[in-house]
Regions:
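Alpha-helical transmembrane bundles and membrane-interface segments of multipass inner-membrane proteins
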Residues: 1-162
Length: 162
């Protein structure tokens, strides 16, 4: 069963890398406004989420490798477990690998999705992100949900992979 989850993770990594390649090809000179609150704007992030640890590439590469190895192992060990748990591991793994590829190849992570809000000439901006960041966030939400609500009820409810 693990091979299916690895396959899904690989598809997400490929989509992440494809969108980053498109961003690097088409957003170099100017941003593209899609909606009044959404634009595609190229950014090179040398830090982690919200530019935390900016410039600490080797530390972030090490952390990315450790997290990737951990989630590869966790997926492999899931002979039976909840779909929520497997989804969490798969999404986090895909996001970690997607951003790790960028860090190792380019020294920074390509971000390009930008949500913002303009009110009374003030711009409220959410940090620019990418598909890998979205996968990590959704995976973390699934993992928290699993830890809080499903971990103890899996055996009785039959929400199993096998």
């Amino acid at each position: 069963m693990a091979k299916w989850w690895y396959g899904i993770s690989a598809i997400i990594v490929c989509l992440d890398q494809a969108t980053k390649m498109l961003a690097n090809n088409y957003l170099v000179t100017e941003a593209i406004n899609l909606l009044p609150i959404l634009s595609l704007r190229l950014a090179c992030n040398t830090g982690a989420a919200f530019s935390i640890l900016e410039g600490a590439s080797w530390l972030l590469i090490g952390v990315g490798v450790i997290f990737s190895a951990y989630f590869i192992t966790q997926i492999w060990r899931l002979l039976s477990g909840s779909i929520c748990e497997a989804s969490a591991y798969t999404l986090i793994l895909a996001g970690a690998i997607g951003n790790l590829i960028d860090r190792m190849a380019f020294g920074c992570v390509t971000d390009f999705v930008h949500f913002f809000y303009i009110s009374n000439n003030d711009v409220y901006s959410f940090p620019i992100f990418n598909l890998a960041d979205t996968a990590i966030t959704l995976g973390a939400a699934c993992w928290i949900y699993f830890m809080l609500f499903q971990e103890n009820t899996n055996k009785s409810e039959g929400n199993k992979l096998n």
